[in-house]
């Protein structure tokens, strides 16, 4: 039988706790993201995005930079007025979090799957794909 060094056990424990903490931190960043998105908070959204972020909108074949995204907030603010956004994390591992999000606009709703890559406390990549034209699958 092999003896496991207490140092190895300690190192493994610290690594696991840091991964759990990072996953929880990513969840908090995602929660902040949707809260800021709902009220079109340009300052908070800008703070959450890394300067070199790439935001891929699969359905329309567009990749936005941080500057592109922030510039679109005025238009988004009009679209999101009176809306609700519900989201739940489907999985989170290795800095990547996949979210199912229902965008419930006053006249329609849509179900999206969004994947965020978080590093150093900021969103460094995001991919958004439509799942359904309504939120019945949420």
Protein language model regions, located:
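Short beta-strand edge/turn micro-motifs at domain boundaries
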Residues: 109-138
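Short, aromatic-enriched amphipathic alpha-helices that serve as compact interaction elements
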Residues: 23-41
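Bacterial N-terminal signal peptides
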Residues: 7-17
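A short gly/proline-enriched turn/hairpin at secondary-structure junctions
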Residues: 54-64, 79
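Positively charged n-region of N-terminal signal peptides that target proteins for export
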Residues: 1-7
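Short, well-ordered alpha-helical segments enriched in acidic and aromatic residues
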Residues: 40-52, 56
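Surface-exposed, charged secondary-structure patches
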Residues: 67-113
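A mature extracytoplasmic/lumenal domain signature
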Residues: 49, 59, 102-105, 130
């Amino acid at each position: 039988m092999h003896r496991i060094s207490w140092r190895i056990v300690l190192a493994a424990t610290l690594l696991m706790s840091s991964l759990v903490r990072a996953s929880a931190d990513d969840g908090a960043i995602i929660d902040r993201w949707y809260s800021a998105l709902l009220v079109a908070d340009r300052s908070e959204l800008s703070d959450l995005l890394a300067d070199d972020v790439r935001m891929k909108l699969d359905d329309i074949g567009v990749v936005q930079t941080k500057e592109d995204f922030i510039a679109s907030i005025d238009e988004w603010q009009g679209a999101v007025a009176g809306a609700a956004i519900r989201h739940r994390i489907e999985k989170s591992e290795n800095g990547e979090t996949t979210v199912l999000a229902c965008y419930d606009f006053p006249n329609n709703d849509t179900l999206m799957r969004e994947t965020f890559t978080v590093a150093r406390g900021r969103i460094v990549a995001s991919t958004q794909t439509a799942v359904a034209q309504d939120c019945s699958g949420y």
